[in-house]
Swiss-Prot record:
Basic residues: compositionally biased ranges: 253-274
Any one GO molecular-function label of the UniProt entry: rRNA binding
Its job: One of the primary rRNA binding proteins. Required for association of the 30S and 50S subunits to form the 70S ribosome, for tRNA binding and peptide bond formation. It has been suggested to have peptidyltransferase activity; this is somewhat controversial. Makes several contacts with the 16S rRNA in the 70S ribosome.
Keyword rRNA-binding: yes
Family of the protein in this entry: Belongs to the universal ribosomal protein uL2 family.
GO CC annotations on file: large ribosomal subunit
HAMAP family per record: Ribosomal_uL2_B
Known partners and oligomeric status: Part of the 50S ribosomal subunit. Forms a bridge to the 30S subunit in the 70S ribosome.
One Pfam family this sequence matches: Ribosomal_L2
Organism: Proteus mirabilis (strain HI4320)
Keywords of this entry: Ribonucleoprotein, Ribosomal protein, RNA-binding, rRNA-binding
Identification of the protein by name: Large ribosomal subunit protein uL2
Gene name, Swiss-Prot/TrEMBL: rplB
Single GO BP term: cytoplasmic translation
UniProt feature, compositional bias: Low complexity: 39-48
Amino acid sequence: MAIVKCKPTSPGRRHVVKVVNPELHKGKPYAPLLEKNSKSGGRNNNGRITTRHIGGGHKQAYRIVDFKRNKDGIPATVERLEYDPNRSANIALVLYADGERRYILAPKGLKAGDKVQSGVDAAIKTGNTLPMRNIPVGSTVHNVEMKPGKGGQLARSAGTYVQIVARDGAYVTIRLRSGEMRKIPSDCRATIGEVGNSEHMLRVLGKAGASRWRGIRPTVRGTAMNPVDHPHGGGEGRNFGKHPVTPWGVQTKGKKTRKNKRTEHFIVHRRTKK
């Protein structure tokens, strides 16, 4: 994997920084694991915009990724690594001994020809999935379940990981990249290693059009609008002299939005400020 800085042959290429991985498959994805992925344009079923700055972009097919990794006791061989337009991480196509193929998240260091396995008896090796009660304390894992059997929900983006810091009976304590420490049932599964493609954060799109290819529309500042369009709008010069709010007058930039007291007691330590 290499970081390539493009030559300034045009204004749109001048600032582009790409991540090039020669190990990625250059052909088409595995068709039986594809689904149609329709774009919403940020609209709900009434046709109203519920999420701004979404629209357009290149047509994409959804890759069905196995986050549960529940095919226990059957070894699988990594056939190839692939690009996935729906996530920052790369994915791996694995062939199980019984002939079934599945997509999994590609951990760091995984390559074509490697063997992976799931279940209680799986070895502590990159790409293998086990219940967290069977994973040694101090191990780095990803694709972590929060409810047994639900499938991985934590640490699925490129370069992310979770560390197991303690085990106490029915729960294990994990440390997230944010600094938060929380308890999770020890029957929940996790995959050994960290998610690959950690260089994803170093890429530079270089031009507005690259965002449009990804379905991201421009974001207009409230202070650049008229008073009829935004609470920050209008005035002489660039000032709005009030606390930052959304276009609908709700406080933003730092206002707490978490309302999930049901799981508060699982959080041992809050995330730390960066």
